[in-house]
A protein has these predicted regions:
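Acidic, PIN/NYN-like endoribonuclease modules and their adjacent C-terminal/linker elements
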Residues: 110, 114-116, 120-162
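Hydrophobic/aromatic ligand-binding patch that stacks against planar heteroaromatic rings
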Residues: 36, 106-107, 125
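Short, well-structured N-terminal submotif of metal-dependent ribonuclease cores
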Residues: 1-46, 62
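Short His-Asn-centered micro-motif
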Residues: 11, 48, 117-119
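Residues that scaffold the ATP/ADP-binding catalytic core of kinase and kinase-like folds
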Residues: 18-20, 57, 125, 142-143
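Alpha-helix capping/helix-boundary segments
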Residues: 15-16, 50, 104, 121-122
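PIN-domain endoribonuclease scaffold, especially VapC-family toxins
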Residues: 34-92
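Active-site neighborhoods of divalent-metal-dependent phosphate/nucleic-acid chemistry enzymes
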Residues: 78-114, 120
Length: 162
């Protein structure tokens, strides 16, 4: 499976939070989300749990930016109903059985989508190569690159900005 030009992506809620938590800053993670939103050839996938997470975090970090970004992502997102067999296949890789993480992984397994998440709970399923997952930092490096020296200084880890 290659990620050089993804066609299907699932953007975990922690990536969304990284993009919106400080609306005064334009983070690299924000740039990554905008990149995916602008690409007509990339389908953004979600599931019912992820939709609820996005809406909840847009309320926790209220700002026009958070509301607009949540709306843009959710308007573009194709909501996937996850089959039980994919949930069962993913469950053993999650200690403690975090249902949201299991559902996100199962969504990716069922559809072949690339998962972008900063959650370390996905490391076991990633290492087993059941799904393909990148951290936000890896995705930023791959698709949007670091900021130029003329832009806000910082690392390409989703926390940079002014």
């Amino acid at each position: 499976m290659t990620t050089a030009n993804p066609r299907l992506v699932l953007l975990d809620a922690n990536v969304f939070v990284s993009a919106i938590k400080d609306p005064a800053r334009s983070t690299d993670t924000f740039r990554l989300l905008v990149y995916f939103l602008e690409r007509a050839d990339i389908r953004i996938l979600a599931n019912e749990i992820l939709v609820r997470e996005y809406l909840r975090y847009a309320e926790v970090f209220p700002s026009p930016t958070a509301a607009a970004l949540a709306s843009a992502v959710l308007d573009r997102a194709e909501i996937v109903g996850v089959d039980e067999r994919f949930l069962k296949a993913c469950a053993p890789y999650f200690q403690g059985g975090n249902i949201a993480d299991i559902v996100h992984a199962a969504t990716c397994l069922q559809t072949g989508a690339l998962l972008i998440s900063n959650d370390r709970h996905f490391e076991a399923i990633r290492k087993a190569q059941l799904i393909e997952a990148l951290t936000a930092t890896e995705a930023i490096r791959r698709w949007v690159g670091p900021r130029s020296k003329d832009e806000d200084p910082g690392k390409a880890d989703g926390r940079s900005g002014a």
